[in-house]
């Protein structure tokens, strides 16, 4: 899977997209066959997959956290399942935020582990079994929708309202991970984050296909202290411009930005540049929670950058406050029906 989305994926399709179309067609065929025909293992407990249509960020991780909070409110013990992208460990691992680093398990699992039991595993089937053995009674899988390794009891596809599906082309012509029709067929519901127009066409198509549609916003968790502050905003995430908009919405004056690749591990020179530039201009450094975990536990100038950077925390808040609980309940009902069918009673 492509890890970085080139800028032309997010604009109207041009000659580059069309030049790559033969490769995209072949990629799409393979992806469709895998999604439709692969033998999926049955998870030991109810499983929600939080995925997206495209390469890159759409808000899956904060959505997964919101669902875990709803599960805990129901008296359940949720467990997160992640492949651990960006981490080096290739064995099934229960993530310990006090022990593991982003280089070990990936940055997103460290964020998830602050909320609930989290397992990283290259083989998601093994990871699901480990979560159940650790006491999880519902699994929330962060990404992996197109992998076709596990049966989902509920598949929620997240789409950003400002980016949508980019130019709508398949990898490598565009950011789409598998043919839209195949993805919709395997989806239970869509979650549109934000109120921009870029996702509307796909949302209407999904609604016509009978898929449930949810809407949410990304909400800042700040105390207003950023208002009027001159900042150097830095981020190594899939959509840094979205973060910079969030910083501006917090009232900060964004004097400069520094963007890095998603899941980027910072070099000493990059760290020194951020610290020295902010100090010379009198700017406050500000970043994302996901970037901060890649600095912790840090030493030397990495620790200095972590200490000098402010984090703007965010959460996903559904327009319908009951929506996360409804998703949990639907997942539990689907899992019960799945088990009845497996036992020959459905």
From Swiss-Prot:
What's an example GO cellular component term for this entry? Answer: plasma membrane
What InterPro entries does UniProt report for this protein, alphabetically? LpxK, P-loop_NTPase
Q: Which UniProt keywords apply?
A: ATP-binding, Kinase, Lipid A biosynthesis, Lipid biosynthesis, Lipid metabolism, Nucleotide-binding, Transferase
Gene Ontology terms describing biological process: lipid A biosynthetic process; lipopolysaccharide core region biosynthetic process
Reactions catalysed, as given in the entry: a lipid A disaccharide + ATP = a lipid IVA + ADP + H(+)
Q: Which domain of life is it from?
A: Bacteria
Q: Name one GO molecular function term.
A: ATP binding
E.C. code: 2.7.1.130
Metabolic or biological pathway, per its Swiss-Prot or TrEMBL entry: Glycolipid biosynthesis; lipid IV(A) biosynthesis; lipid IV(A) from (3R)-3-hydroxytetradecanoyl-[acyl-carrier-protein] and UDP-N-acetyl-alpha-D-glucosamine: step 6/6
Ligand binding (ATP): 54-61
Purpose = Transfers the gamma-phosphate of ATP to the 4'-position of a tetraacyldisaccharide 1-phosphate intermediate (termed DS-1-P) to form tetraacyldisaccharide 1,4'-bis-phosphate (lipid IVA).
Q: Which PANTHER family match?
A: TETRAACYLDISACCHARIDE 4'-KINASE (PTHR42724), TETRAACYLDISACCHARIDE 4'-KINASE, MITOCHONDRIAL-RELATED (PTHR42724:SF1)
Its family remark reads: Belongs to the LpxK family.
Could you identify this protein by its name? Answer: Tetraacyldisaccharide 4'-kinase
């Amino acid at each position: 899977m492509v890890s970085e989305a080139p800028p032309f994926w997010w604009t109207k399709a041009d000659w580059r997209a069309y030049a790559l179309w033969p490769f995209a067609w072949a990629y799409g065929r393979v992806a469709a066959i895998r999604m439709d025909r692969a033998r999926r293992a049955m998870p030991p407990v109810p499983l929600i997959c939080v995925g997206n249509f495209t390469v890159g960020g759409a808000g899956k991780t904060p959505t997964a956290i919101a669902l875990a909070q709803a599960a805990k409110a129901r008296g359940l013990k949720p467990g997160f399942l992640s492949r651990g992208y960006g981490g080096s460990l290739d064995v099934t691992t229960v993530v310990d935020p006090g022990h593991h680093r982003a280089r070990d398990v990936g940055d997103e699992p460290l964020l998830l582990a602050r909320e609930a039991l989290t397992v990283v595993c290259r083989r998601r089937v093994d990871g699901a079994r480990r979560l159940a053995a650790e006491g999880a009674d519902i699994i929330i899988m962060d990404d992996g929708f197109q992998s076709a390794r596990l049966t989902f009891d509920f598949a929620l596809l997240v789409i950003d309202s400002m980016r949508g599906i980019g130019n709508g082309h398949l990898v490598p012509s565009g950011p789409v991970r598998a043919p839209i029709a195949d993805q919709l067929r395997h989806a239970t519901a869509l979650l549109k984050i934000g109120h921009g127009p870029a996702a509307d066409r796909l949302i209407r198509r999904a609604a016509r296909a009978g898929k449930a549609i949810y809407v949410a916003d990304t909400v800042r968790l700040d105390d207003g202290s950023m208002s009027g502050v001159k900042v150097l905003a830095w981020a190594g995430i899939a959509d840094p411009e979205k973060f910079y908009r969030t910083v501006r919405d917090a009232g900060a004056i964004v004097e400069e930005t520094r963007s890095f690749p998603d899941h980027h591990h910072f070099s000493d020179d990059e760290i020194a540049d951020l610290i020295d530039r902010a100090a010379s201009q009198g700017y406050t450094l500000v970043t994302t929670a996901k970037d901060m975990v890649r600095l912790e536990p840090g030493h030397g100038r990495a620790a200095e950058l972590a200490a000098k950077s402010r984090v703007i925390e965010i959460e996903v808040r559904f327009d319908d406050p009951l929506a996360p609980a409804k998703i949990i309940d639907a997942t539990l009902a689907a899992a019960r029906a799945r088990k009845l069918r497996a036992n020959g009673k459905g």
